[in-house]
C-alpha cells in the first residue's frame, strides 16, 4: 500500500506539472497517502500499546502529525466530494455537456433569490 501511495503521488505531481486540471488526481493521491499512513501508524501504535502514547517513542508524534495531514488541506471526506465532482464533470464533458457548474456561482449574488412556496 505504501508503494502504491508513493506511486500515485508521483503520478499526481506529474499531472500537476503537465495537466490543465489535476484536481481529481491530486485529491485521490492526498486521500490515499494519508489513509495509508494512518493505517501504518495506527498499526505501530497497536504494537507499542500504552507506551506508544507517551513521548518516549516518536509514534505519538507521528500519529498526531498524520491526523493533522488528514484534516489540514481538506478533510478526506471533502476529498471524496472533490473526486466525485471531478469524475462526474469528466463524464458530462465526454457526453457533450459543457456546462461548468463552478461558473454558476460567479453571478449568484446579483440574481434575486428564488422562493418556492
How does the language model describe each region?
Residues 1-117:
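Alpha-helical interface subdomain recognition
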